[in-house]
Amino acid sequence: MQNIIIRKKKDLPLVNVAVAVIQSEDGYVLMAERPYGKESSGSWEFPGGKFELGESAEQALAREIYEELGIKPKMAYPWISYKFAYPNKRVKLHVFRIFNWEGTPSGREGQRISWEDSDAIRVSPLLPANNHILEVIKLPLLYILTNTSQSSMVKFMEVLVKLFEQGVRLIQVCTRHMNPEQLTQITRPIVKLA
């Protein structure tokens, strides 16, 4: 009789990973193939790698991007963080957006790299943990949270019009203290404005 060990996802080791979404001026994102000899070699991903002992997410990102691609980010913007479970481990991805860097990206570990349209990634297979990034990258960079209970509706709409004029396209209206009638009263003008 064979012993089968069933592990719960929460019991799997958690690996912290710094990930870079490097975006060119024309909107393309840089994808890198996992090099031969590494786990999941041949799969494509956003560049990055595991934290070393004592490193912050920013330090791990800068080190990994330089080691893998030979570039130094001028600024890396913390963007999203999430966990993903593989059969043998869990990863926590600390994802950064990079729009400016020094150097020319190249596969310094023998890996192929490719500039891809984030709406139509051609390289495959992709590591599954990267799918969430591809969903979120379609959202606008600027996300406004509102608190309507602290202002009048007229003032709120004036501010909202200015934000729309400045290019804001994603707004979350905090409605914790609103009844359905108040919610309808505030959302109708917002929908018309959009």
Segments (PLM) and residue ranges:
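Short loop/turn motifs at secondary-structure junctions
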Residues: 72-74, 92, 109, 164-167
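Conserved N-terminal beta1-alpha1 strand-loop-helix module at the mouth
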Residues: 105, 135-194
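A short coil-to-beta-strand element that immediately follows conserved catalytic motifs
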Residues: 71-81, 96-97
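Conserved N-terminal beta-strand and adjoining loop/helix that marks the start
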Residues: 4-30, 81
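NUDIX/MutT-family hydrolases
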Residues: 95-97, 105-138
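Conserved Nudix-box catalytic region and its N-terminal flanking loop in Nudix hydrolases
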Residues: 4, 28-68, 80
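Active-site-adjacent beta-strand/loop module that shapes the phosphate/pyrophosphate-binding cleft
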Residues: 24, 82-104, 119
